[in-house]
Amino acid sequence: MSKQNLIEIEGLVTESLPNAMFRVCLDNGCEVLTHISGKIRKNYIRILPGDRVKVELSPYDLTKGRITYRLRSKNTNT
C-alpha cells in the first residue's frame, strides 16, 4: 500500500498491551489497536499511557493502526 492512501490522525495512548501493542483513543473518539513503527522501535523511543501520538490507519481496516510519532508533552518538567 502506498503512503498516500494512509489516514494520519492524532490520539492519546490509553493502555499498554503485550508485544509492543497499544490501545489509542483517537481525537474523533474512536479507539484503535496499534503497534509501533520500525523507526520508533529501532531508536528505543518509549511510549507510555498518557502520551500523545500520531497514528497511521489503513482505509481498509480502521480498527488497527501504526504509531509513527510520539508528540512532545506540553509540560516542560518531564
Swiss-Prot record:
GO-annotated cellular components:
chloroplast; cytosol
HAMAP family per record = IF_1
The record's section on NCBIfam families has: infA
Task: Give the family per the record.
Answer: Belongs to the IF-1 family.
The residues covered by the S1-like domain are 1-72
| Record keywords | Chloroplast, Initiation factor, Plastid, Protein biosynthesis, RNA-binding, rRNA-binding
Outline the subunit composition.
Component of the 30S ribosomal translation pre-initiation complex which assembles on the 30S ribosome in the order IF-2 and IF-3, IF-1 and N-formylmethionyl-tRNA(fMet); mRNA recruitment can occur at any time during PIC assembly.
Q: Which Pfam family, just one, is annotated for this protein?
A: eIF-1a
Q: Which domain of life is it from?
A: Eukaryota
> Where is it mostly found?
plastid
Q: What is this protein called?
A: Translation initiation factor IF-1, chloroplastic
Gene3D superfamilies for this protein: Nucleic acid-binding proteins (2.40.50.140)
